[in-house]
């Protein structure tokens, strides 16, 4: 299990861990950068049916609701779903939260316009069935945004060391390159766009303050060294034209590390 000072760049069953992380200075900086990248790839979600897979305590789902989306969130943890429902009630948000497994999503095919899945593939034994399930519930022409832990980062290196010293969480953690994420999306029948990176600093508060202003510029150069990677993928429709797939426009395409 993670400690109260660890990052929700990893999953945990205790909602208070996430709240404590977001309340810390490094957590607030890191969450802002991660959120900016994911929301930029999602684009305008007003009126769109969005499924948040692995929604945790509902933080991203609430932001999508504020932006006008019709949001559903699922998570394997009842503790997280209870926390998400409580937050939605306090805010008066009309969001449906339910317990559900990413590899067996409890909805009919082609139900959603958009699916977002942030840091869930890194903790499943086989990402293939999860992405195939996501593709199943996504309508033709719909978008998936994936956010995952980058393989070649200082955060990943520290977590590997923790695994060597007995961390059961990080022994099962999987860090991926941008190319691997694109391949997984393609194997599920989706058409992946470019991969973008974020969080290039080590898990150290002064470094976060120093490097955060340069995060977007670094993402334009490379995904190597990024603790967080994200991409958008489209589910092909009949007669689908790749040139008009509708990937959200980012300033510059990043190279996949």
Predicted regions and their residues:
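A C-terminal cap/extension of S-adenosyl-L-methionine-dependent methyltransferases
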Residues: 192-257
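Acceptor-substrate binding/catalytic loop of class I
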Residues: 163-180
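A conserved beta-strand element that flanks and buttresses the S-adenosyl-L-methionine
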Residues: 116
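Class I SAM-dependent methyltransferase SAM/SAH-binding core
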Residues: 51, 57-104
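A short glycine-rich, Lys/Arg-flanked "PGG" loop and its adjoining helix->strand segment in the class I
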Residues: 128-140
């Amino acid at each position: 299990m993670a400690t109260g000072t660890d990052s929700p760049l990893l999953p945990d069953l205790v909602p208070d861990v996430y709240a404590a992380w977001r309340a810390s200075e490094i957590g607030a900086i890191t969450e802002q950068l991660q959120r900016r990248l994911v929301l930029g790839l999602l684009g305008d979600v007003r009126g769109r049916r969005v499924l948040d897979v692995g929604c945790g305590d509902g933080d991203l789902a609430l932001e999508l609701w504020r932006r006008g989306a019709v949001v559903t969130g699922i998570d394997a943890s009842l503790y997280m779903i209870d926390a998400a429902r409580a937050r939605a009630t306090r805010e008066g948000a009309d969001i449906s939260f339910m317990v559900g497994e990413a590899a067996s999503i409890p909805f009919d095919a082609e139900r959603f316009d958009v699916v977002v899945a942030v840091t869930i593939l890194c903790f499943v034994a086989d990402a293939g069935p999860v992405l195939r399930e996501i593709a199943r519930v996504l309508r033709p022409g719909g978008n998936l945004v994936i956010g995952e832990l980058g393989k070649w980062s200082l955060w990943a290196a520290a977590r590997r060391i923790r695994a060597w010293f007995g961390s059961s969480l990080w022994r099962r953690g999987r860090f991926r390159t941008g190319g691997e994420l694109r391949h997984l999306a393609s194997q599920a029948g989706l058409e992946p766009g470019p991969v973008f990176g974020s969080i290039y600093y080590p898990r150290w508060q002064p470094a976060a303050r120093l490097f955060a202003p340069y995060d977007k510029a670094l993402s334009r150069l490379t995904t190597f060294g990024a603790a967080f990677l994200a991409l958008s993928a489209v589910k092909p429709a009949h007669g689908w034209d790749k040139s008009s797939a509708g990937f959200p426009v980012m300033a510059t395409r990043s190279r996949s590390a």
